[in-house]
Amino acid sequence: MYKHVLVAVDLSDESQFLLEKAAGVARRNEAKLSIIHVDVNFSDLYTGLIDVNMASMQDRISTETQQSLVQLAENSSYPVAEKLSGSGDLGQVLADAIEKYDVDLLVTGHHQDFWSKLMSSTRQVMNNIAVDMLVVPLRDE
């Protein structure tokens, strides 16, 4: 029996579908449901001098992310307790959230295309967390 289900979303069109899958599990277990989005840390991508205000860009992205998470939660068929966002290493951010919020099931999506088979973030996440995972196939059309 799960007590807290965390669904990792990328804020793409499939995010609502993935959230509804997680909502179904949470509903059946009478569990808490939360969502999380992890942004890449843009400052880590640049090694040279660039005339870009990274702090301003990160703030704007963070605000847009939070608004998207709120909208996603409002459209959920099940109440969403926490709307989390983080930046940095996907596996580490998820592991930290799982520990901090006492999550016992992580729900993620997985694209079944050529590139995802080569470079799946799901594999990395599986190596970093110690709770059950539900990996939902997301088919590209």
Swiss-Prot record:
Its main location: cytoplasm. Required for resistance to DNA-damaging agents. GO terms for cellular component: cytoplasm. It comes from Pasteurella multocida (strain Pm70). InterPro entries: Rossmann-like_a/b/a_fold, Universal_stress_UspA, UspA. This is Universal stress protein A homolog. Pfam families: Usp (PF00582). It comes from the Bacteria. Belongs to the universal stress protein A family. It is found in: Cytoplasm. Homodimer. Keywords: Cytoplasm.
